[in-house]
């Protein structure tokens, strides 16, 4: 599990965070100061990269949280079997079986190159080249 620890106040919308053991992309981040002696709080909402579930937390801004180290890679589509795509990594020539994303179903064909990500042991095809 490759993660890095940062404080919530350093995060921005569009960055990634680990919530509930899943890598998630931050969709909104608001901070508020509750009063004279209270610490500022951050309300963070995120959507899971791999499962598309919405998650939210409310924590003090100086709380330390994990952010995933996301590895972006390029692969070539070798074959398509139903809802699975067989890819060959263009750097180390490993062969991978990944699920076909619904939004890219009509764009992915054999022989094209795709960008995919690896985070927390999961992999997902992001876009075609």
UniProtKB/Swiss-Prot annotation:
GO terms for molecular function: ribosome binding; RNA binding; translation elongation factor activity; translation initiation factor activity. Disulfide bonds: none annotated. It comes from the Archaea. This is Translation initiation factor 5A. One of its GO terms (biological process) is positive regulation of translational elongation. The modification Hypusine is found at residue 36. Functions by promoting the formation of the first peptide bond. PROSITE patterns: IF5A_HYPUSINE (PS00302). SUPFAM superfamilies: Nucleic acid-binding proteins, Translation proteins SH3-like domain. It is found in: Cytoplasm. Gene3D superfamilies: 2.30.30.30, Nucleic acid-binding proteins. GO terms for cellular component: cytoplasm. The gene is eIF5A.
């Amino acid at each position: 599990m490759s993660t890095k620890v940062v404080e919530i106040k350093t995060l921005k919308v569009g960055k990634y965070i680990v919530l509930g053991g899943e890598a998630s992309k931050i969709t909104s981040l608001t901070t508020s100061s509750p009063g004279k002696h209270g610490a500022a709080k951050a309300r963070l909402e995120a959507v899971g990269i791999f499962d598309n579930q919405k998650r939210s937390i409310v924590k003090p801004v100086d709380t330390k949280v994990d952010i995933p180290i996301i590895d972006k890679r390029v692969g070539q589509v070798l074959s398509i079997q139903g809802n699975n795509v067989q890819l060959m990594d263009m750097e180390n020539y490993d062969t991978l079986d990944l699920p076909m994303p619904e939004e890219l179903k009509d764009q992915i064909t054999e022989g094209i190159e795709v960008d995919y990500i690896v985070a927390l042991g999961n992999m997902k095809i992001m876009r075609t080249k």
